[in-house]
Amino acid sequence: MFSVQQEGYVAILALHRPPANALASSVLKELSERLDAFKEDDQVRVIILHGEGRFFSAGADIKEFTAIETSEQAAELARAGQQIMEKVEQFPKPIIAAIHGAALGGGLELAMSCHLRIVAENAKLGLPELQLGIIPGFAGTQRLLRHVGMAKALEMMWTSEPITGTEAVQWGLANKAVPEEQLLDTAKQLAQKIAQKSPISVQAVLQLVNEARTKTFHECVEKEAQLFGQVFVTDDAKEGIAAFIEKRTPQFRGK
């Protein structure tokens, strides 16, 4: 279901599950396993996640819903999805979602779990679960609220109407919108810029930003001071400062 292509320190993870790249349980399981492998691979510093075919992902596999008979089973399905979305968001290496076609329901929940989002201008992004008489279950209510604010999040969920990629940028849901034919190249360019930085520094910033969700400002500021001290004495920091003084491009090794 997933294929991997590597370009330098960037791993391009493509989902291929036609026709709509639905997020079946087997897809989420494989995604988790792929992330485990990337975490241990020093040659992977940044990951791009995108969908093959017409869509990024049109959502959860509705056929799996028909096998659910109890409230407890449904809640367990939601918790399993939430766990993988949290794993994506807490992943120590940057994950960029490259979104074309549609990111709907679980597809948008997955995209929102990624750290950055590049979208095709004409892509459709939404949480249409209420159209089925249900609600988002993979933490979509919370992440959409975080990105676009209460009023827009409620509007999108209550109406089930998606927004375009261009609108997603305007609402803070995506970083950049480009013509679809430029999507993957734009994501690669961004990924390569990040991959050129010290992976130690990149991961430290990601850790601090993630901790801000659950800790106080002063706790995070203290953690920032601690990590500043740890990063400052690394070989990468010495290389970066030396390269600046010598007016050359630094070569970071992640040490």
Where are these regions (language model features)?
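Extreme N-terminal starter segment of soluble prokaryotic enzymes
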Residues: 1-3, 10
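A structural preference for short, pocket-lining loop segments at secondary-structure junctions
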Residues: 8-16, 29-69, 86-98, 116, ...
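Charged catalytic carboxylate motif
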Residues: 26-30, 80, 87, 186, ...
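A short acidic, glycine-rich active-site loop
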Residues: 67-79
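Crotonase-fold acyl-CoA enzyme core
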Residues: 87-200, 230-234, 239-242, 248
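Short C-terminal tail/terminal secondary-structure segment
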Residues: 249-255
